[in-house]
From Swiss-Prot:
Protein's organism: Drosophila melanogaster (Fruit fly)
Keywords: Cell membrane, Membrane, Receptor, Transducer, Transmembrane, Transmembrane helix
Protein name per the record: Putative gustatory receptor 36c
Primary gene name: Gr36c
One Gene Ontology term of the molecular function aspect: taste receptor activity
Lineage: Eukaryota, Metazoa, Ecdysozoa, Arthropoda, Hexapoda
Tissue: Expressed in neurons of the terminal external chemosensory organ of larvae.
InterPro entries membership: 7TM_chemorcpt (IPR013604)
Length: 390
């Protein structure tokens, strides 16, 4: 077993273990199916999570003061909003996985079958899989260390809440990892068909310059046309996968990236509070501060990985359009080959690739930079409010 197969298997079984995945598939055949034991296990575990949250919320516990000791009201609001959003997003993700189970199975079937049909994708995406796995594992590990550290400074009545918060974080992290893996496979497929498209164009150039023997020329043109039609078919499948991802992961993605945004603002404010008051005055230890900063670094680095792969998919799509633009130099080729080039070009123009969040926000570099600008502005506003009122 190679490294990427081992890592993908670990992600697959971990998703089943934590109750996020509620169906199974075979990496070797591409078959997606359900089993009684995995379905019952997911139902039991997810039901247990909801029941424990209901039980926990009936209690009256202020974990912010328990951890920070001298937290002011603004600290409590910031931490409560961030924690509450993470919990709601995690629970909503579990509900969506059951509500959209058939759609998820259909999406997984398309992705796994393309993965099986083109094994070179696995090799090309090796470093992307490894990088995401390492950063995700480190983030999970640091989150667990923070929970264990917090348990050492609070009463046992808070243990359940801390454990449930960690479980929600693990579920969200795994959900984003699954989405990232699909996007990574899509990007690798685009890179592969771009390489194939360049090869076809180079062969067409050579065909124009070589002496034309009618039988050989027609056979070669038909072969190139078949390759172009195969590229168009794969691109259409990738477009379908992207559209299905928007439908399946749209709401979850909006809540998750909204959480990243609010968490970034809150983290900037809490970092300012530590510098202003000192971690001792917030009843924090140096090890807790180091853990928190380390977790933030890998958490946001992991988020940047998720963002970068989406931007790179769009770059590969536009690169495909640029490569295809070179077809205008082909004059006098076989009619079928010319039509294959033209049909592929029309297919790309009529149905352009766009990555949106619930059709409200386009994921582009310009919008991303604008979002970072707003993040800095809102962080400054929150710090100014603290200066004026606390």
């Amino acid at each position: 077993m190679d490294l990427e197969s081992f890592l993908l298997g670990a992600v697959y079984y971990y998703g089943l273990f934590i109750g996020l995945s509620n169906f199974e598939f075979d990496w070797n055949t591409g078959r997606v199916f359900t089993k009684k034991w995995s379905t019952l296990y997911a139902i039991a575990l997810d039901s247990c999570i909801f029941a424990l949250y209901i039980y926990h919320w009936t209690g009256n516990t202020n974990i912010v003061n328990a951890i920070f000791g001298r937290a002011n009201m603004l600290h409590e609001y910031v931490v409560a909003i961030l924690t509450g959003l993470r919990i709601v997003t995690g629970l909503f993700t579990l509900i969506l996985r059951w509500y959209q189970r058939c759609k998820m199975m259909d999406l997984a079937s398309k992705v796994v079958r393309m993965y099986v049909a083109r094994p070179q994708v696995r090799r090309m995406s090796r470093w992307g899989i490894l990088t995401k796995f390492i950063f995700g594992s480190i983030t999970d590990g640091l989150q667990m260390a923070m929970v264990l550290s917090a348990m050492g400074s609070v009463d046992s009545q808070f243990y359940l809440g801390l454990g449930l918060q960690y479980w929600m974080f693990v579920i969200l992290n795994m959900a984003m990892m699954q989405q990232h893996m699909i996007m990574l496979f899509v990007r690798t497929q685009f890179q592969l068909i771009n390489t194939e498209l360049r090869q076809v164009i180079d062969e067409a150039k050579d065909l124009l310059l070589s002496p034309r023997h009618q039988g050989v020329f027609m056979t070669k043109c038909c072969s190139l046309a078949d390759q172009i039609e195969n590229i168009a078919r794969i691109q259409s499948q990738l477009q379908t996968i992207m559209n299905q991802m928007e439908e399946v992961f749209g709401i979850q993605g909006a809540m998750t990236y909204g959480g990243y945004y609010l968490s970034s603002v809150g983290t900037c404010y809490l970092a300012y509070s530590i510098l202003k008051h000192g971690y001792e005055n917030l009843s924090m230890t140096l090890s807790t501060v180091i853990l928190a900063y380390s977790w933030c670094f890998f958490y946001y680095l992991d988020g940047m990985l998720n963002l970068s792969v989406m931007l790179h998919v769009q770059d590969d799509y536009w690169e495909m359009l640029q490569i295809l633009g070179k077809r205008t130099i082909f004059v006098g080729l076989d009619v079928r080959l010319e039509e294959a080039f033209e049909n592929l070009n029309l297919q790309l123009i009529r149905n352009p690739l766009k990555i949106t969040v619930v059709k409200l926000y386009d994921v582009t570099r310009s919008n991303t930079m604008a979002m970072f600008g707003n993040l800095i502005t809102h962080s400054i506003f929150l710090i100014q409010y603290d200066i004026e009122h606390f």
